[in-house]
């Protein structure tokens, strides 16, 4: 089967959706499928190469307490038509299909089976509220809908009601199979591990505030922070100015 994985974010820049797409690509190829990743260009990632097809240019912008991407091109329709005619996909798998403008245009012009995975979760979203009114046609072209969690399903169903199958993000267990526990943190103290981008949507500052409350109440739990991002300096300052112990 020939499959196109459509990501609204510039591939392979770091991020949860792109990581999801990467592992899907690798595992689908292991199962004998012919797979392409369809993305935009940005910075050093300018031209199509190998199994990566680039259309338009991606621009980063803040959205929903995180960083999103909007893709623009003066020749979107002709580029997408040429790509679809050339590749002749059996199935297109869209990730966040309503993020402008690459995914909606591909979805509108697709003659393949169209599947979508929804990753996002948030409160009220003006952009999704607007999208629910102008992208009904694109939503109707989806043959299957996946949400990575119950929370993601609840969020997207609010704006695009329909039948969603919850399939959680996979974990590459081989990567951790030979991992050896670090003796440094095997001292009987309870460890709380945070792995993710330091940004409002991930809640790293909320976690630090909760940890501070627990320490005041006598907890000796240790908070381990792994990651980086726009709130890293603020997080370090919070720890230092409040002399917050038990954080590494």
What are these model-derived regions, one by one?
Residues 3, 91-93, 98, 103-124, ...:
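Active-site proximal beta-strand in glycosyltransferases
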Residues 7-13, 21, 25-74, 82, ...:
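N-terminal strand-loop element at the rim of the active site
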Residues 41, 151, 170:
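Carbohydrate-associated surface elements
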Residues 47, 126, 154, 158, ...:
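Acidic anion/phosphate-binding donor-loop and adjacent secondary structure
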Residues 62-91, 101, 130-137:
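An amphipathic, basic-hydrophobic alpha-helix
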Residues 128-147, 151-159:
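Membrane-proximal helix-turn-helix segments that form the acceptor-binding/catalytic region
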Residues 183-212, 224:
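Conserved donor-binding/catalytic core segment of Leloir-type glycosyltransferases
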Residues 233-248:
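Nucleotide-activated donor-binding/catalytic signature segment of Leloir-type glycosyltransferases, i.e.
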